[in-house]
Amino acid sequence: MSSQPNPTSHPEAASAASAASNDPVVKIDSLDMEARGVGRLENEDGTPGKVIFVEGALPGETVAYRSYRRKPSYEQAHLVEVKQASVMRVKPGCQHFGVCGGCSMQHLDSRAQLAIKQRVLEDNLWHLSKVKPDVVFRPIAGPDWGYRYRARLTVRHVVKKGGVLVGFHERKSSYVADMTHCEILPPHVSAMLVPLRELVGGLSIHDRMPQIELAVGAEVTALVLRVLEPLNDADKDLLRAFADQHQVQFWLQPKGPDTVYPFYPAEQELAYTLPEFGIRMPFKPTDFTQVNHQINRVLIGRALRLLDAKPTDRLLDLFCGIGNFTLPLATQGASVMGIEGSEVLTTRALANAEYNGLAAKTSFACRNLFEVTAEDIAALGRFDRWLVDPPREGALAVCKALAELSQAGSDVLPKRIVYVSCSPATLARDAGLLVHEAGYRLAGAGVVNMFPHTSHVESIAVFERD
């Protein structure tokens, strides 16, 4: 373990360290949602003073800091020096950590990352909604590195850097990090970052390609090039040669997401697999799919166990996407209805059910679930169990509808809801409605480490109603 912070934890850290003796010191008590260390000063009369948010500091550490933003009740600061290091501090696994904004917690032991994320989840549930789970689930965790199968890479032609940069933004900046590799991307993709820079630099439109979307499937790695001007014949030849050499598939996006099309090789199928269920899921690189394939498989397994559906049950999958949960549920013998707000994803879910021979057990509908009413829910009829997997905005309208139906004495409410969340704040808000107004109890909740080394907190919760 390292007793000093990574010198790249902030661009100013190395130069500032020489003046550390002149900088104020604070004891760090916790981390906030952005993985910043949180400490509190003490006023001269002994009363609690300002809160200090220190980038790169960890709980239990005493650090010297330098403020860059001052407000009456708090300050935001850069880490200058670790005076007393936490036993949780480790050496970051990537040389670009601290400059690149892709990760914020590589300096923290992976087990401690999980513990902190679990605490963030429980704190949100209690402080925002006064809800506690009956049981805290064991965290769902997987590989710490090479897990990111989806990513959006920014492309920027920077004359001062001598050419094109391809990578994530610098931390809290619009600049692109000068990256030669990335430890959270699959190794074969990480190895392509420098060749991609060279490829784009050789194109006639090297300054008219703002981003590259990455989607890795079971056999195919797709790269979607956002092109603001057409490629010429020489450009196309360069792309074909690169695709053959690096075994990738190029897609082009001349305008909005609906204009994406496969360029070369056009005949390859992008798909991910769920081998435990004998399922193959074709998708387009612009479709929403989970970033972390390994965690997704474990998450599906836990969701199915928590639902504990019988073959005679009717199941409802809200925000179903391309059928990530719907189709595995259907393999268990139950009848499943998936509802999704995107027409494109609904169409893909229908096609995937047909592709996997599950059309007879599934049905799909396209509805705006952010504006759903109690009448809309009642019109669906009764489903025994629900799975809800909303985006960061959560499922507020759905939970409000359930609360209204509960208060009206409706019999359409499910006995069990499994809720997969990518925002502890919106999960807490929705849990408050379900528990305090819809008659449910929070039977269990736990974190899902979909994004190791970041402050993103994904989770799974189960609600039960007697």
Swiss-Prot record:
The keyword S-adenosyl-L-methionine applies. Pfam families: TRAM, tRNA_U5-meth_tr. Its EC number is 2.1.1.190. S-adenosyl-L-methionine binds at residues 290, 319, 324, 340, 368, 389. Keywords: 4Fe-4S, Iron, Iron-sulfur, Metal-binding, Methyltransferase, rRNA processing, S-adenosyl-L-methionine, Transferase. It catalyses: uridine(1939) in 23S rRNA + S-adenosyl-L-methionine = 5-methyluridine(1939) in 23S rRNA + S-adenosyl-L-homocysteine + H(+). Gene3D superfamilies: 2.40.50.1070, Nucleic acid-binding proteins, Vaccinia Virus protein VP39. The keyword RNA-binding does not apply. The active site is at 422 (nucleophile). This is 23S rRNA (uracil(1939)-C(5))-methyltransferase RlmD. The gene is rlmD.
